[in-house]
Amino acid sequence: MTQWKADALTHALETSPREACGLVVVVKGRERYWRCENLSDDGDFFVLSPDDYAEAEEAGEITAVFHSHPKSLAIASNADRMGCEKSGLRWYICNPGAGTWCSIDPNGYKAPLIGRQWALGV
């Protein structure tokens, strides 16, 4: 396991049962895990702190987004896939209890209309 993955897993274990979130940043040629505050009111979702994102961006090149699924499998949800597309970055997802990982890359994913939650004006 790479050092950044070990650091991300430690973060996820510390924040469980809330989702942890962070970034993978290349600083001076090395990948580093950048812890970010999860601003979501709901522990089953994550919202990266814009201040943490800006600090990471100043420190180096952001190459990926990380978050944990402490209550479910390390499998990308539709929301994860849409977020990955919007960010244009690889996403890593980890279940800290099981120690399992997955990653997804932007690939043109569009959420299906059937089964999508309806919201006025969206």
Language-model-derived ranges and their functions:
Residues 68:
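Extracytoplasmic ligand/sensor domains, especially the bilobed periplasmic-binding protein
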